[in-house]
Amino acid sequence: ELLAKEKVDVIFGCWTSVSRKSALPVLEELNGLLFYPVQYEGEESSKNVFYTGAAPNQQAIPAVDYLIKEMGATRWVLAGTDYVYPRTTNKILAAYLKSKGVKDEDIMINYTPFGHSDWQGIVSDIKKFGSAGKKTAVVSTINGDANIPFYKELGNQGISAEDIPVVAFSVGEEELSGFDAAPLVGHLAAWNYFQSVESDENDEFIEGWQRYIGDDERVTNDPMEATYIGFKMWAKAVEKAGTTDVDEVEQAMIGIAVPNLTGSIAVMNANHHLSKPVLIGEIQEDGQFEVVWETPDTVIGDAWSDFLPSSKNLMSDWTAPLRCGNFDVTTGKCSG
């Protein structure tokens, strides 16, 4: 309807990967343009989508590296909601961990439905799994409102962040807003932006958002920054192309650079993914995050994982002459 009836030039949106994948065939058929602002599982590349959220190598992989190097984790719980993003991300993470020498018996994988609230049995299993004498960490792709009862049950069973740290990919300022964050203090999240980051751009953005919404307690979060970056880039690309035509703007987007909110520069690459910093934040009592680690430079998002046999030889480059989203470097063939 937005494309065929309203004739919109661009869409900024979709939340879950399910919604994005549902919209994708329509976008490609009607030649629409989508800026997708949420972290996702990778393994996808479309001419009609710019992925301004994190790919796995801009969130999941660095988070695991942090837990290995800084916290000495050797045993892993991959806990997620049962849909495409957690399942694909955990498939990548399991392969990555095995490439690091982690054995199958040191990886526990668990999936729960959306909105899951009874965590007693699962947390008990995690506690037992973590009692084998090896440093255990939880990598969480649990989505939405299921997170709060999960963390509460960790506390109920006496599991602290020092005992078994949890790093989450779907818990941010908005999810913690209005909740008692005490059970979550010390646990971690991996994003490309936190509201607590100190920069002039961030101060201006927060002030403008709170003024617009009429609430000086309203929080900001990573998908908001990704949307902000995408919109500024699209505006620059339209100015560069001199038109809102999708094909012209899509090509003009490549190489566009704008300031992000963390004090560095976001660049749109030929694979329709951003260069972004990766930050690890520790949850505080007020629901904000203290940044405890960040990459020294921005990281280019990778559409295809290096750790899955099905995609390790694939690359995405939407510039001429290649103009391909899944080019196999071993066969020299493009599949789309």
Listing of model-derived features with the role each one plays in the protein:
Residues 5-10, 29-34, 46-48, 71-75, ...:
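Loop/turn elements at helix/coil->beta-strand transitions in domains of secreted/extracellular proteins
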Residues 153-228, 238-244, 295-331:
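Extracellular/periplasmic periplasmic-binding protein-like sensory domains
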Residues 41-42, 48-157, 196-204, 266:
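Extracellular/periplasmic Venus flytrap/periplasmic-binding protein
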Residues 2-15, 35-37, 75-80, 133-144, ...:
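Periplasmic-binding protein-like
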Residues 257-336:
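Solvent-exposed, acidic/polar segments of extracytosolic/periplasmic ligand-binding ectodomains
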Residues 1-43, 52, 111-120:
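Beta-alpha junction/loop-to-helix N-cap segments that form part of ligand/metal-binding clefts
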Residues 13-14, 78-81, 216-225, 245-249, ...:
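Surface-exposed patches in mature extracellular/periplasmic domains of secreted proteins
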Residues 3-8, 24-32, 65-73, 94-102, ...:
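Sec-exported extracytoplasmic/periplasmic mature domains
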